[in-house]
């Protein structure tokens, strides 16, 4: 590993993280109690009067609030429509989150696109500029199809809740080259036909794989494209701690890469060997070494082609 990559990995771990996991087959109260027991605090409460969304909350040893909220987009009975919303996390908290996910799975919780459940990951945007956000948008535009195939993103979700980058947004962004965040926001909302209610939570511009509405309202970059595998007779699936960590690592490295680039192109990458294209891209992003081996596996396993040779053996 060269010095530049090592520094990049060091920096990506300094970013803040927020995760939302939609699931069912578990009540919000039970999930909150399970979390409170997992944290060793035993503290969980019904907090809907403050948080809305029929929320139950659990607190960890650092007094951080983990919310379990009702999300009507999830299939199933209302009592078991459950969305985990984490507090602001750091890289070292990922293991704690993974352990909680494992316990939720053992308790019967299920999450996959077949029940309308996805995974949203937020990365703190405080160190980003209009140029680095433009870089990130171009990185996503040039690799979204590859990522969608790698994750086998449900087409229904792509049509509604996690659309690809709007071509009009990319065209205007790269033509106008916004110098400040106000100009960037104007391009984002007008190009996406959502110039109304910019401060409203459910502004329609949010329903993209890369959601900058969160940037302007919450100070985070939201990646809305993730999902867990649907359970089969052979594998329980539905929630997977290793898969979740892989998704978080991808978001962190994309955000950090965007900060280090002078410019980025929205032009789509080669597609004759998707597995090779993804593997080499992940390496360029900095997902190298044993620490990111699981991420490389999850992000290439569904793609066709030869990971080692672009034109085959």
Language model features with spans:
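C-terminal accessory/tail domains of diverse enzymes
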Residues: 1-113, 126-313
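Short, conserved phosphate-binding/catalytic loop or strand-edge motifs used
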Residues: 115-119, 123
